[in-house]
């Protein structure tokens, strides 16, 4: 395949077109007056979303080099979403602002590497200032405010997330599911989550979410590795006859055993999934015992005199539902006896009192939360499927933002925190004029989120940015109410982690784009013309 190779300004200008195409599509969603984007789907009805990363993921450009620029900005949005769960649109807007300002300076003769050093120094200074501005979340009301902002100013969702966190604690497990009707509600169920995902993606039952969902499954808990199908076959046959799904939790499942399970799952002969046991060493044994007590099963362990080939259905635990993604397994409503669970909880509490190690105490606390905390399920109701998907996206965003806020605290929202942090750039040392220019690029770029919020509200950005810069503390512009006020008192707050990661990831990719001197991509294939059709009729006929 022939390649096209572009250098210097030509390469960067092409990349810029891709960056602008994606960023312009994403930034229409920013702020309280941001608009929706409709995404065409190959199958089913179009999706309507105000979630920046959903828009970014859907964009592919025809030109290969422009598409490279778009894909790199998509990486910023995806990474920010993965790490913080929100802030994807802010990250995209910042990337575009840093890259475009940098591009003008490179075209004017600035050294890209010195610009990058200046940008990196400035970003470090801004992040240090954000940490100083940050304020710990202290009550349920502030949790509701963070969730409300992330859910596009939906107060109902904000209150529900705060309510769910009250029920299961800040470290508890909250899952989002579709409701049968139009009502949205929160329910708490006894449940447990551990940090092990499925052993093979072929076990996935819900391909949209890439999750395994098992209803009323049997749960086989084994403390050794399963490699041979021979030892697993007797219990598998019993499960197949019962017609129920099976989850295998073992030290590992590999080789012939894993291959056979995958083949049976693909053929539809058996609804099955396998995950590795959580923890290591003695903690693994203790956690397997916790799972067994929660689900009413028995840990099949040769130390206790049990062999896998002799196992029957009586040894298996059961639960109402199990959800497994690539990282976590959640067991909902295990069938274990209440008395046994209470006894186990009390045993862990006494171990916590007797231990002298902070590490052990922390791990025991984790086990205690898993056994007694439960899982909160948010059932999202909507009138149509399209509305349901859009609402679920917003709830997911809000949940992630709230967790981020609990983790690292909050800063004033509406783009104010970044503008206030700009003062820290006055003290950043630089070695040459190009580094100074890099610092100046960040000074200008940190205004871009507020400019985009104001633009989406139908107003002129420069005037409002200047007025906000003249203020102090959390004084900013409330685009929803069209007035200037104290952001935190008005409930306009952002998680510190979201703002920090948006800037870090944006600066990282924008700097790489600026220091690009050459781009190599496939030449577009020319479609060959259709061959001429043969003449109709038969030769030689009179």
Swiss-Prot record:
Pfam families referenced in this protein's UniProt entry, alphabetically: Cpn60_TCP1
GO BP: any one term: protein refolding
Localization, UniProt: Cytoplasm
EC number: 5.6.1.7
CDD domains: GroEL (cd03344)
GO molecular function, one term: unfolded protein binding
Catalytic activity field: ATP + H2O + a folded polypeptide = ADP + phosphate + an unfolded polypeptide
UniProt keywords, alphabetically: ATP-binding, Chaperone, Cytoplasm, Isomerase, Nucleotide-binding
GO CC, one annotated term: cytoplasm
Xref: Gene3D superfamilies: GroEL, GroEL-like equatorial domain, TCP-1-like chaperonin intermediate domain
Subunit structure: Forms a cylinder of 14 subunits composed of two heptameric rings stacked back-to-back. Interacts with the co-chaperonin GroES.
Protein name: Chaperonin GroEL
Gene (name only): groEL
């Amino acid at each position: 395949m022939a390649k096209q190779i572009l250098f210097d300004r030509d390469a960067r200008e092409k990349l810029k077109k891709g960056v602008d195409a994606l960023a312009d599509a994403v930034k229409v969603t920013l702020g309280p007056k941001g608009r929706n984007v409709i995404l065409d789907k190959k199958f089913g009805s179009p999706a309507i979303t105000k979630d920046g990363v959903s828009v970014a993921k859907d964009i592919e450009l025809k030109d290969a080099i422009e598409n490279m620029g778009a894909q790199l900005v998509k990486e910023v949005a995806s990474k920010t979403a993965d790490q913080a769960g929100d802030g994807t649109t802010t990250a995209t807007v910042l990337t575009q602002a840093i890259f475009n300002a940098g591009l003008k300076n490179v075209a004017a003769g600035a050294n890209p590497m010195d610009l990058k050093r200046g940008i990196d120094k400035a970003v470090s200074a801004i992040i240090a200032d954000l940490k100083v501005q940050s304020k710990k979340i202290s009550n349920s009301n502030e949790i509701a405010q963070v969730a409300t902002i992330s859910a596009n100013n939906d107060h109902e969702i904000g209150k529900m997330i705060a309510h769910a966190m009250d029920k299961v604690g800040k470290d508890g497990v909250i899952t989002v599911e579709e409701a049968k009707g139009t009502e949205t509600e929160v329910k708490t169920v006894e449940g447990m989550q551990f940090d092990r995902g499925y052993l093979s993606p072929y076990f996935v039952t819900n391909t949209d979410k890439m999750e395994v969902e098992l209803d009323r499954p049997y749960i086989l808990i084994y403390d050794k590795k399963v490699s041979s199908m021979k030892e697993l076959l007797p219990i598998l046959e019993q499960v197949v006859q019962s017609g129920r799904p099976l989850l295998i939790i073992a030290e590992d499942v590999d080789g012939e055993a894993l291959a056979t399970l995958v083949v049976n799952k693909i053929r539809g002969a058996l609804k099955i999934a396998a995950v590795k046991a959580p923890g290591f060493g003695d903690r693994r044994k203790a956690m397997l015992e916790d799972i067994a007590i929660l689900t009413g099963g028995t840990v099949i362990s040769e130390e206790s005199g049990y062999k896998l080939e002799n196992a029957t259905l009586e040894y298996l635990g059961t639960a109402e539902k199990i959800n497994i993604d690539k990282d976590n397994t959640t067991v909902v409503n295990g069938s274990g006896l209440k008395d046994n669970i209470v006894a186990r909880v009390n045993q862990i509490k006494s171990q916590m009192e007797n231990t002298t190690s902070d590490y052990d105490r922390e791990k025991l606390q984790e086990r205690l939360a898993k056994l007694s905390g439960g899982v909160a399920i948010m059932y999202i109701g909507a009138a149509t499927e399209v509305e349901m998907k859009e609402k679920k996206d917003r709830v997911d965003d809000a949940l992630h933002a709230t967790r981020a806020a609990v983790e690292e605290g909050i800063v004033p929202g509406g783009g104010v925190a970044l503008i206030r942090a700009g003062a820290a750039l006055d003290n950043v040392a630089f070695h040459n004029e190009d580094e100074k220019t890099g610092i100046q690029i960040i000074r200008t770029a940190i205004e871009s989120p507020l400019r985009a919020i104001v633009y989406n509200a139908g107003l002129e950005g420069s005037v409002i940015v200047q007025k906000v810069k003249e203020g102090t503390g959390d004084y900013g512009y409330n685009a929803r109410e069209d007035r200037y006020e104290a952001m935190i008192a008005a409930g306009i707050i952002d998680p510190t982690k979201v703002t920090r990661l948006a800037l870090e990831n944006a600066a990282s990719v924008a700097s790489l784009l600026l220091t690009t001197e050459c781009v190599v991509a496939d030449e577009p294939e020319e479609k060959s013309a259709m061959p001429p059709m043969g003449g109709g009729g038969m030769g030689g006929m009179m």
